A protein has these predicted regions:
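Alpha-helical oligomerization segments
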Residues: 152-195
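Charged, amphipathic alpha-helical regulatory modules used
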Residues: 2-100, 110, 118-144, 155-161
Length: 195
């Protein structure tokens, strides 16, 4: 997943906390957090399923790629772009679209539309503002939190790269150190998953 599940839960809590009182009224914030968390996790899982489908298709094309001299990454990108267009999926990865965050601006907007639609149907809350204003508040909160996450992610990767010995990116040791430093960096920004 592009975002760790614990971070998605934190993100959901923060979004609900930031829009409660101003954009929505709820007597059951835990239920609203659950709605937000479920939707975001489902959206992230859809991207993972798409990537798995692309990998399965790539296995079928391995001989063709070898004969034509096409790299795995290029073919992955081509097949994924084709499936994204065919299935009308909004691309989740912000780095693929040039956004500075892990999630693309388009994906954040797509999720905000779906959240507002779910909120309108929910009996656990009441919208205090116009639908679009609520959606814009969600996008703003989402973006601010993801920008902090991006800073923490970048700082943790830089920390691992600055270790005296050479640790190749993608190795198990790199991943373990990066997760440790990532948690430390998030704490510096006041992001704790236990709350």
């Amino acid at each position: 997943m592009l975002l760790p599940r614990e971070f998605v839960t934190y993100l959901s809590r923060q979004i609900v906390q930031r829009i409660s009182g101003t954009a929505i009224d709820t007597h059951q914030p835990a239920r609203v957090i659950e709605i937000v968390d479920t939707l975001i996790n489902d959206e992230m899982a859809a991207e993972d399923r798409l990537n798995d489908e692309v990998r399965d298709l790539l296995e079928d094309y391995s001989d063709y790629m070898r004969k034509e001299g096409i790299s795995y990454q290029d073919m992955f990108r081509k097949i994924k772009n084709t499936l994204v267009q065919k299935k009308k999926i909004v691309r989740a990865s912000g780095r693929d679209t040039g956004d500075g965050m892990k999630l693309s601006r388009d994906k954040i907007t797509d999720i905000s539309h779906k959240l507002v639609a779910l909120m309108r149907k929910s009996r656990d809350l009441r919208l205090k503002k116009d639908q679009n204003d609520v959606r814009l508040d969600i996008v703003k909160a989402f973006t601010e939190i993801l920008q902090v996450e991006e800073k923490a992610d970048r700082a943790s990767r830089d920390k691992v790269r600055s270790v005296k010995r050479d640790i190749p990116e993608g190795s198990e040791e790199f991943d373990i150190l990066q997760k440790k430093y990532y948690a430390e960096e998030l704490k510096k920004y006041g992001v704790e998953f236990g709350r």
